[in-house]
């Protein structure tokens, strides 16, 4: 049986680019899936589950990256990772002020 492959090009929208914190968020999310994940910038392709590899891309605001996932959960992995990038890496940071029981 062939493994599913899904890919999409995304643009880094956060002003600080893909520095340590968002790279860590990306890698942690990628590692929740069994699919392999790769990220391509220009002619360079790196392991999307390795923070050091992601950081070597030096992706700044406006950089286009192609994310590819291959495996049983490729579509779900790609959707989650693209949403994270599209939202400027803010998905895992809900405002605690909005959850206050005192409001």
Where in the sequence are the language-model features?
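Signature of N-terminal electron-transfer/Fe-S-associated modules in redox systems
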Residues: 3, 20, 33, 79-80, ...
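Compact, glycine-rich, soluble single-domain proteins
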Residues: 11-61
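Detector for Asparagine
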Residues: 14, 31, 92, 98-99
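Long, contiguous binding/interaction regions
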Residues: 28, 79-80, 101-102
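N-terminal loops that bind phosphate or other acidic moieties
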Residues: 3-8, 12, 51, 96-103
């Amino acid at each position: 049986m062939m493994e599913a492959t899904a890919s999409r090009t995304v643009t880094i929208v956060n002003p600080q680019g893909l520095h340590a914190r968002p790279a860590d968020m990306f890698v942690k999310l990628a590692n929740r899936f069994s699919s392999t994940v790769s990220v391509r910038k220009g002619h360079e392709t790196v392991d999307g589950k390795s923070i050091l590899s992601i950081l070597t891309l030096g992706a700044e605001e406006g950089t286009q990256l192609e994310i590819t996932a291959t495996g049983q959960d490729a579509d779900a992995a790609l959707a989650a990772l693209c949403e994270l990038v599209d939202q400027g890496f803010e998905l895992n940071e809900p405002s605690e002020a909005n959850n206050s029981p005192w409001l």
